[in-house]
Amino acid sequence: MWIKELNLTHYRNYQQASAAFSPGLNVFIGDNAQGKTNFLEAIYFLSVTRSHRTKSDKDLIYFDERDCSISGTLERLSGRVQLEILLSDKGRITKINTLKQAKLSDYIGAMMVVLFAPEDLQLVKGSPSLRRKFMDIDLGQIKPVYLSDLSHYNHVLKQRNAYLKSVHQLDSDFLSVLDEQLVTYGSRVMAHRLAFVQSLAKEANKHHQAISNGLEKLSISYQASVSFEHQQEIYQQFMDQLKTTHQRDFLRKNTGVGPHRDDLIFYINGMNANFASQGQHRSLILSLKMAEVSLMKQLTGDNPILLLDDVMSELDNIRQTKLLEAVKKENVQTFITTTSLKHLSQLPKDISLFKVNKGTIALDSVMID
């Protein structure tokens, strides 16, 4: 798939903007604070209905306006698709081919993206919530049913925690009813995550070995808060562990086990990547991002769109070359933001170059090798 055009109204610093893209490489160039990342963020938001930079939709609306819209035309293997998101103080509306989508799981997945931004370099050493978010975003695009299971799980978890905080004496029978619902959805979430991480680890290691010239092996371990050896055991193990922590949960007023406590651990040559060098971290994240691209292609049969937000300047020449080689091999539509082409000496010549300046975007040139 590839996005053919994007239209913004009252989005960030764009009062009105439109751009048509090539199915290959698209580069946004401009000084800092002109709107390059905002434009890339809009593509990302149109896909996953969330920003990678803010939790508040209000931050996305142009100064002194009450609403904004993002719309785009997507070319998929199955045909052309029109996507639109409307944001206002009343909430948000998502549309596919002008039809409102009642649930996020009905919308997300229509356009798949993989984002590589500077903050992704914190994925290994950052909080576990970052790694859970990483799994959620990928799985949500690949498997819509995952979002449904996760949404139901979070709803029951909120109910359970609210109950624990509100009572002075535990009603085990009532808690068991909540446990049953929590385990039903939670075990599905963990099963999805386990299968995803196992597949992702294989792809990531392939890319990492290519980047390291065969010197390093990358492995990823899914650290579920529920102990189990086989996928078939997840439901029963989760139920058993939840029952044994009733008193603990009552005293602490929260739920101590479940997928909301999951984590990932990365290893390079068997050593925890927390202790890896800065260069190794960059190689690891680069491998992970290209593995996301490969896996989405494998599991859905269509290409995701790759968004590279000012990351080329974070990579040395060798890693830049490896990244661009991988992009060329995967043959996916790619967007790159940069302040200068000097960081992009390894770029192929067949690119569409857009100049971004003070909330305007214009095609500067199409260079063909």
Curated annotation (Swiss-Prot):
GO biological-process terms attached to the record: DNA replication; DNA synthesis involved in DNA repair; double-strand break repair; SOS response
SUPFAM superfamilies, alphabetized: P-loop containing nucleoside triphosphate hydrolases (SSF52540)
Location (main, coarse): cytoplasm
Molecular-function annotations in GO: ATP binding; single-stranded DNA binding
Keyword annotations of the record: ATP-binding, Cytoplasm, DNA damage, DNA repair, DNA replication, DNA-binding, Nucleotide-binding, SOS response
Cellular component GO terms, alphabetical: cytoplasm
Pfam families listed in its UniProt record: SMC_N (PF02463)
Localization per Swiss-Prot or TrEMBL: Cytoplasm
UniProt xrefs under InterPro entries: DNA-binding_RecF, DNA-binding_RecF_CS, P-loop_NTPase, RecF/RecN/SMC_N, RecF_2
Binding site for ATP: G30, D31, N32, A33, Q34, G35, K36, T37
Keyword Ion transport in annotation: no
Cited HAMAP family: RecF
Family per similarity comment: Belongs to the RecF family.
Role of this protein: The RecF protein is involved in DNA metabolism; it is required for DNA replication and normal SOS inducibility. RecF binds preferentially to single-stranded, linear DNA. It also seems to bind ATP.
UniProt name for this protein: DNA replication and repair protein RecF
Organism: Streptococcus equi subsp. zooepidemicus (strain MGCS10565)
